[in-house]
Amino acid sequence: MSDLPYKEKIHLVSTYSLWRKMTSSLKWILVIALGVGIGNIISFPALDWYSNNQSQNLFFNSELGGNNATCNIAVIPIDSGIVTVTDEESLGMKGNFNTSADDIVDVITEAEKVDRIEGIMLRIDSGGGAPVASEIIAETIKNAKKPVVALIREAGNSGAYLVASAANTIIASPMSDVGSIGVTMSYLANVEENVKNGKQFVELVAGKYKEVGNPDRPLSNEERGLFQRDLNIIYSQMVEKISKNRKMPIEQIRQLADGSSMPGTLALKNGLIDELGGQETVRAWFAKKLDLENNEIEFCKPVWSVSDKE
């Protein structure tokens, strides 16, 4: 699956808590992540637009055309990098957006308020993102009063898989890229390049570990140990949450949590998903769950597409 866009060195530098350390002459970013690289982050307009609209106006029919509001399954895309808030300026990527946990939570909350919305489909195309952001979405899904289906399309990896694991069921294509359960915190060191270019790093710091991870200084074994400690803690929490969400033995999840991903067919065999299929499979699942006919299940237009019209 290395030819998939999400898999183009997804694990190089990724997105979790962005720690920005700045002085008048120094800016650097260190990133911890459950998956997707910063270079891969492309997403949608934030949902500020709908705050002045009624909840009903978020969910229009996608299958029948027009703005008639008779659809009963909300469709929420989770694409690109998952972060807590959308803040392109702080990421230094003006004009690009992420999948914001705050936005996803808001839309799920709105869907819960609308009586005619009987279920929620998460349409996942994501290599992952921030641990906390992924956890926030997952917890919201677990607490949802309406049934939730996660449909993994091209990819549902790492933090995005954590999100999917909280749904009532997970459906994926036989060719979907699934899993990649693990945590990464990597960066490109500039030390040798700086020496080659005649640049000297001047460290002014109070606090022994304040500059740990600065790419312009060498990383000691002791400092590496600090990072590995944190990675191991986050990894253990991720494995535990997925184990609980999927109702699978933690040892079974741990064996699968080596950072690798797998196609949907193997994910089904390993218990990471529940069924192979696409949107029509989702339709059939909701029809059975809600005691309706298949033709009575109508998917709403994805909420970001609605926002694009405003």
PLM region spans:
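N-terminal organellar transit peptides
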Residues: 1-159, 169-173, 185-310
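Active-site loop architecture of trypsin-fold serine endopeptidases
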Residues: 175-183
